[in-house]
From Swiss-Prot:
Residues 6-81 form the GIY-YIG domain. This is UPF0213 protein Spro_0507. Disulfide bonds: none annotated. SUPFAM superfamilies: GIY-YIG endonuclease. It comes from Serratia proteamaculans (strain 568). It comes from the Bacteria. Belongs to the UPF0213 family. InterPro entries: GIY-YIG_endonuc, GIY-YIG_endonuc_sf, UPF0213_domain, UPF0213_GIY-YIG_endonuc.
Length: 102
């Protein structure tokens, strides 16, 4: 029997200060609600209203973790470009991994 693995997503949240937070999850809506309720990352607690700025499918957990690492290495300008002009694919960040934005 084949086990169905969940699809992971990379997401970016914008804080009122303009800062972008990057994370991964299997359910973007659920994770955003957790963050807004103060039950997510400590870095976001008490930061005010969070807005989903970007999200994309990232494949399995391993690929999602690698993509998250690469996005966190981007400069603020590069992250803002990613948010304002979402590419059709994030393959350029992980040449060995196919990732669809959406």
């Amino acid at each position: 029997m084949t086990e169905i693995l969940p699809t992971w997503h990379l997401y970016m949240l914008r804080m009122p200060s303009g800062m972008l937070y990057t994370g991964i999850t299997t359910d973007v809506t659920r994770r955003l609600a957790q963050h807004q309720a103060g039950k997510g990352a400590k870095a976001l607690r008490g930061k005010g209203q969070l807005v989903l700025a970007f999200h994309c499918q990232a494949g399995d957990r391993s690929k999602a973790l690698r993509l998250e690492y690469r996005v966190k290495q981007l400069s603020k300008t590069q992250k803002e470009r990613l948010v304002s002009h979402p590419p059709l694919s994030l393959d350029y960040l992980l040449p060995d991994v196919a990732v669809k934005a959406g």
